[in-house]
Amino acid sequence: AWAAVALGYTTTQASGLVGVVAIGTAAGALAASVIMKLDRATGVIPLGIGMGLLVIGMIAIHDVRVAAPFLALLGGLGGYLVVPMNALLQHRGHNLMGAGRSIAVQNFNEQACILGLGAFYAGMTRFGLSAFGAITVFGLAVAGTMELIRRWHARNRVRHQDEVERLLAIARSDKH
């Protein structure tokens, strides 16, 4: 809907922008796989807050020459965020329930979130919110959720310091 309103794109033209996001995501994921270490994975949480706020910037973009690099940047941030978060979830899940079950639970939750966010967006537009309004609400929801996760993690580092340090020691010692 955004590409149609902001850029005057058809669905077919807008599908090319998905490819731009995918290229950015792949580049960000590759960078994260080289740069990030498991014991520092939670350090990317602020990127999620930034991504949510950056998404709101889409409402000011009306030129594909600006949109394409912007969407590639968003994809890059997403790729850089998701690799360490997935690695952390899989590592913790492996220690709790085994690798196969951990990955299955993680994939289920990811797909459920995709479905839920799609329904959230569809609901907003169905009840008359413009594409720009829905993007703003979505961006604020992502940034707000990531801020809650950041605070929860900070609280856990204080309340459960010994357990967090134990888990970090395991993460530092694992060589995968």
What are these regions (language model features)?
Residues 1-13:
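Short amphipathic helix-loop junctions that connect adjacent transmembrane helices
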Residues 27-41, 125:
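Helix-to-loop junctions at the C-terminal end of transmembrane segments
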Residues 16-25, 106, 110, 141:
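Transmembrane alpha-helical segments of major facilitator superfamily
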Residues 11-19, 100, 104, 135:
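Small-residue hotspots at the loop-to-helix junctions and early N-terminal turns
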Residues 58-59, 137-172:
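Multi-pass alpha-helical transporter architecture, strongest
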Residues 29, 70-121:
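Substrate-agnostic recognition of the 12-TM MFS/MFS-like secondary transporter fold
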Residues 49-63:
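C-terminal ends and interior cores of transmembrane alpha-helices
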Residues 10-13, 42, 119-143:
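A membrane-interface helix-boundary motif in multi-pass transporters
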